[in-house]
Amino acid sequence: MRTIAIDAMGGDNAPEAIVEAVLKAKAEMPDTKFLLFGDKEQLRKLIPSDQINDQLGVVATTEIIADEDEPVKAIRRKKDSSMVVAANFVKEGKADALLSLGNTGALLACGIFIIGRIKGIARPGLMPTLPVQNSDDGFNMVDVGANAKSKPEFLLQWAEMASYYAEKIRGIQNPRIMLLNNGSESDKGDDVHQAAYELLKDSDLNFQGNIEGNELLLGKADVVVTDGFTGNAVLKNIEGTSSFILHILKDSLLNGGVMTKLGALMVNGSLSSLKSKFDTAKYGGAILLGVNAPVVKTHGRSNESPIYFTLKQVDKMIKENLVQDFKDEFATK
């Protein structure tokens, strides 16, 4: 039976939304065990007594890593936090994967320092799936913040892992790989990006060249590789812009005149489609590529739906032996 360790105390809607998602996933995934780490009393109140069985368990912890905690200090000092205890279960082989909605930096630290890097991987990278305008498939972008500074060989390894993920987990044949840069020409960018371009071009990947920031959502790439500093800034920009657009539309329609509101009723289906396009819940969470087990981060504001989809994503990663394939591949390099 596959086992997912879940930090039940991380995120704005914890533990209620997490328990709701787990109960829904449990009913659909009979070969998967869910271990919830957190305040035992709170969790027991939320879980019907008949649901506690071989497929669902609670591991009592007494501490929580808060969003404002300094990541590395937090995982060292809060040994009995829900996140750290869950990470140690994965390290010790008592669980196959770790999921959290909590402090991103602390989760990255748990992945790197507790669960550990895959032999042969220079630096793990954080990878979400983001929407595009002409497809429901979206695209993967890595790294979006696990590393402040990057070397060309880091970007090559991230591209290799992301390409394999896109093919095996998302079902995309021969994924198109592109390098985020400040121009489409091969000589664009600083020394790191120029060197990364050459490494990607000489690899066995389906490398399609550079991509600029204004093209990211056009569906030109299945995987976009970038340094962590730039990737994090771009990710926040995409999230902020989508939120801004939806807010402006909603405000205009609700505060407009009678004719505006009548018009809104007529285009309600199109507006719902637009909102759905920006909704990344169906893609699951962001993956820390390059560590010894699946470590996945879901947005801290998530409700039941994105958590549920992330549980399905994590389960598929375990089922498909994704991390073991990475270990086999990079051990020989």
Curated annotation (Swiss-Prot):
E.C. number: 2.3.1.274
Which SUPFAM superfamilies does the record cross-reference, listed alphabetically? Answer: Isocitrate/Isopropylmalate dehydrogenase-like (SSF53659)
Which InterPro entries did the record assign? Answer: FA_synthesis, Phospholipid_synth_PlsX-like
Name the Pfam families for this protein: FA_synthesis
Major location category of this protein: cytoplasm
| Gene Ontology molecular function | phosphate:acyl-[acyl carrier protein] acyltransferase activity
Q: Where in the cell is it found?
A: Cytoplasm
Q: What positions belong to coiled-coil segments?
A: none
Cellular component GO terms held in the UniProt record: cytoplasm
| Entry keywords, A to Z | Cytoplasm, Lipid biosynthesis, Lipid metabolism, Phospholipid biosynthesis, Phospholipid metabolism, Transferase
Transmembrane annotation, as ranges? none
According to the UniProt record, what class of enzyme is this? transferase
Could you tell me the Gene Ontology terms of the biological process aspect for this record?
fatty acid biosynthetic process; phospholipid biosynthetic process
Catalytic reaction list: a fatty acyl-[ACP] + phosphate = an acyl phosphate + holo-[ACP]
Q: Copy the pathway line from the protein's UniProt record.
A: Lipid metabolism; phospholipid metabolism
* Annotated family: Belongs to the PlsX family.
Q: How does it assemble?
A: Homodimer. Probably interacts with PlsY.
Summarize the protein's role: Catalyzes the reversible formation of acyl-phosphate (acyl-PO(4)) from acyl-[acyl-carrier-protein] (acyl-ACP). This enzyme utilizes acyl-ACP as fatty acyl donor, but not acyl-CoA.
Q: What is this protein called?
A: Phosphate acyltransferase
Q: What is the lineage of its organism?
A: Bacteria, Bacillati, Bacillota, Bacilli, Lactobacillales
